[in-house]
């Protein structure tokens, strides 16, 4: 194995009940997909804007807050600096709330934006889009074959099929 990669779908934002952790609505939650073109969307009665999108980030604790900075290492998280504005129809009501939202990783905890005492804006776990392994296959005939194996795209070498089953 030379290199393994996981490509992920863009982050999804949703609103949950802070006390139960259940999405709202529970059976079929509303989501906002934050792809590279996303600037603004609506979730329930909240206008959501992304002020900053850091695909690979780590938290930095300052004297009074936690902010995120670019960090291209293992355990990095996708961090979104979001603004959530309560709305009544097309009219803004109240003050916008601003904060970082992440889904967390094995290294860093998730970060939510508290909207009310009962509601929080959260990022769902990132879903894998593609797994790929760049491999070297050494044959009995002294060949070194370099290939990329993906799920449902096996590599055939000397009558053998090499599969990528998952990560």
Identify the function of each model-found stretch.
Residues 1-167:
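Solvent-exposed, non-transmembrane regions of integral membrane proteins
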């Amino acid at each position: 194995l030379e290199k393994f990669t996981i490509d992920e779908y863009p982050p999804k934002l949703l609103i949950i009940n802070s006390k139960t952790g259940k999405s709202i609505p529970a059976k079929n939650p509303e989501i906002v997909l934050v792809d590279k073109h996303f600037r603004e969307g609506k979730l329930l009665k909240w206008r959501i804007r992304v002020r900053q999108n850091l695909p690979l980030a780590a938290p930095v604790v300052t004297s009074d807050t936690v902010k995120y900075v670019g960090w291209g290492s293992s355990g990095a998280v996708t961090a979104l600096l979001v603004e959530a504005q309560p709305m009544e129809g097309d009219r803004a009501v109240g003050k916008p709330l601003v904060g970082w939202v992440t889904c967390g990783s094995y290294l860093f905890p998730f970060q939510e934006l508290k909207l009310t005492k009962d509601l929080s804006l959260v990022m769902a776990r990132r879903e894998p889009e593609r797994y790929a392994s760049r491999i070297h296959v050494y044959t009995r005939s002294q060949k070194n074959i370099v290939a990329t194996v993906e799920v449902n795209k096996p590599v055939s070498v000397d009558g053998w099929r090499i599969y990528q089953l998952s990560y």
